[in-house]
Amino acid sequence: MSKIRLDQYLCQNGLVQSRERAKALIMSGIVFVNEQKVDKAGEMIAPDAKVEVRGHDIGYVSRGGLKLEKAMQVFPMRPDGKVCMDIGASTGGFTDCMLQNGAVKVYAVDVGYGQLAWSLRTDERVINMERTSIRNVNPEDLSEPVAFFSVDVSFISLKHIFPVADAITTPDAVGVCLVKPQFEAGREKVGKKGVVRDPATHREVLQMAEGYAMANHFTPAGLDFSPIKGPEGNIEYLMYVQHCEEPQPLPEGLIEKVVAASHETLDKAPNLH
């Protein structure tokens, strides 16, 4: 018998409703084939393999939704009734989470093409801005300013994101930004496979991100670590920001506290990629 893709198997056997959901489940690390965890959607398996989904469906088209879910649990931010933007949308986990929590419109921005889940691509509340660099987005490109936004981008520093966010958001907008040490630290501080493990570098990167926010009229009002590691096991951070005229820094000692907690919690956690 010829082998089939794992995500295809999940769909054909009624374990999920869509390939996007299948991919999300597989990447979340809860799909097992013949008692072995498999985290690649394209893994080829035998049709008679024993496939199990252990634990719970993550509830979003991708794991990104879990990051925003945590942000809404720990920070006073809600997308209910707001025009939102998902910067670095990819498959659309953040977009999905925003819609499930009452967003009236979401601009899904990504330089890539064809990545946004079909369920979101066909949702009239979603404005699909694929093949679009956030650095090139102007207020004129939007029918109204954004009141709630998220940032989850790769290979670009937040230094280039905050000036755009300043220009396209409402005076009282709020947002959550993924701070990724591997894309903020100097090249000499990034280890093998693009991994940054040194807590000192994490603290330095968070101080830089704090400065980028404040330089563009955003108060970094909260900080926590992402519940999910990035590719290759990088610890990433959630920074909650509020648009304002007179930005204030994070509370004294918070960066040190969060970095310490992130390493204590995630250093031994498995990678889900």
Annotate the PLM regions.
Residues 80-90:
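Conserved class I S-adenosyl-L-methionine
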Residues 1-49, 83-84:
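A basic, amphipathic helix-loop patch mediating RNA/tRNA/ribosome contacts
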Residues 97-105:
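Conserved S-adenosyl-L-methionine
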Residues 107-160:
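S-adenosyl-L-methionine
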Residues 159-176:
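A short glycine-rich, Lys/Arg-flanked "PGG" loop and its adjoining helix->strand segment in the class I
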Residues 181-198:
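Short, glycine-/aromatic-enriched active-site segment of Class I SAM-dependent methyltransferases
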Residues 92-93, 114:
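Glycine-rich SAM-binding Motif I of class I
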